[in-house]
Regions:
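Short helices/loops that flank or line small-molecule/ion binding pockets
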Residues: 14, 73-80, 157-171, 292, ...
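Hinge/lid segment of periplasmic solute-binding proteins
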Residues: 3-52, 63, 68-74, 83-87, ...
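Short, solvent-exposed loop/beta-turn-alpha elements that line the ligand-binding surface or hinge
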Residues: 18-28, 83-85, 89-92, 112-135, ...
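Short helix-initiation/N-cap motifs at beta->coil->alpha
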Residues: 6, 69, 149-164
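Extracytoplasmic/periplasmic solute-binding protein
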Residues: 43-47, 52, 72-124, 168
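Long, aromatic- and glycine/proline-rich binding clefts that accommodate carbohydrate-like moieties
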Residues: 191, 240-289, 296, 320-326
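Glycine-centered hinge/linker elements that transmit conformational signals in sensory
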Residues: 75, 120-152
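Extracytoplasmic/periplasmic substrate-recognition and gating elements
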Residues: 40-42, 143, 182-244
């Protein structure tokens, strides 16, 4: 069976998954290996990778913007002014009240979720200066965007509609968005996310799925052999050909890039700068406070610093309550 990387560590730590041996033929790398490892134990075999990318409308842009400075210039074009609100522009849109989508801003400026590569829940970096700088930059965009972008439930649909109707030139989203854009017959391109104003990469979360073995499997040795088979280069190539999901196997990944598919190439390139999503159980305490932090800051309800401090305080308290601060 398959499980998302961010669930593998917690499920393994809770005793729901058996340990897995990574076969040398799996051709994994350090990033994907870290996504299936918790406390030095491996609970899954990397299957596919994913991360956020930039989609742009080829009917509106000749090439993908390479820097956020270029996106800022694009947002000055009156062609993208939002008709229903004076002074607002939709040239570029992103769902940055969603922590998954906004994390690249924070991490690219030096913020982080947990220390020691996502394994130390006692060290939370969502209110350090880098994280605050990232939130402050998001606020400059929300000053340009229509009020609807602050609707935490409706923002994603608003962004997709604007992009599909040709009112937005570029958006940040994941590989899963491609199917709906194809169905809507949008003439889109895919590229890596532009570099941040500080010149650093937009370090979004790196994720995907792994093959896992349930604890207590009736035939664990046979299950391990099947996992070994599924992660071989040939099988990973076959999986890509069937699903278009980017293989975790590095040799199969090169094969996929060689297919000259823009989405595949962008995901692989962007994944080089991705930060592995923490897979420890304590990660479950982060999502809601982080989303509140972003909304409170970009809506002006709180300063970026106060919003970040309050979020970290709540995360620490919840970890203490649920996990005893261990």
């Amino acid at each position: 069976m398959m499980a998302p990387y961010d669930r593998v560590g917690g499920l393994g730590n809770d005793g729901q998954l058996a340990e897995v041996t990574l076969n040398k033929d799996s051709k994994t790398d350090k990033t994907t290996e870290s996504l299936v490892t918790n406390g030095g134990k491996v609970y899954g075999a990397p299957a596919v990778i994913e991360t956020l990318v930039l989609y742009y409308n080829k009917d509106l842009l000749q090439e993908a913007p390479k820097t956020f400075g270029e996106l800022e210039e694009l947002a000055k074009d009156s062609k993208y002014d939002f008709a229903d609100e004076d002074g607002k522009n939709t040239a570029f849109l992103a769902d940055w009240t969603n922590f998954y989508y906004a994390y690249g801003l924070l991490s690219g400026n030096g913020g982080y979720v947990f220390g020691k590569d996502g394994t130390d829940p006692k060290d939370i970096g969502l209110n350090n200066q880098g994280a605050i700088d990232g939130i402050e930059y998001a606020k400059t965009w929300y000053a340009k965007w229509p009020k609807g972008l602050q609707d935490t439930k409706g923002a994603a649909n608003f962004i997709q509609t604007q992009f599909q109707e040709g009112k937005t030139a570029a958006i940040i989203d994941g590989p899963w968005k491609a199917a709906s854009l194809k169905e809507a017959k949008v003439n889109y391109g895919v590229a890596t996310i532009p570099t941040l104003p500080n010149g650093k990469a937009y370090s979004a979360f790196g994720g995907g799925k792994a093959w896992v073995i349930p604890a207590g499997a009736n035939h664990p040795e046979a299950a391990q052999k099947f996992v070994d088979f599924l992660t071989t280069t040939d099988q990973q190539k076959a999986l890509y050909d069937k699903t278009n999901e980017v293989p975790a196997n590095t040799e199969a990944r090169e094969y996929a890039v060689g297919k000259n598919d823009e989405l595949t190439a962008a995901v692989v390139k962007q994944f080089e700068n991705a930060q592995p999503m923490p897979n420890i159980s304590e990660m479950s305490t982060v999502w809601d406070p982080a989303a509140t932090m972003l909304f409170d800051a970009v809506s002006g309800k709180k300063s970026a610093k106060d919003a970040a401090d309050d979020a970290v305080k709540l995360i620490k308290e919840t970890i203490e309550q649920k996990f005893g601060g261990k």
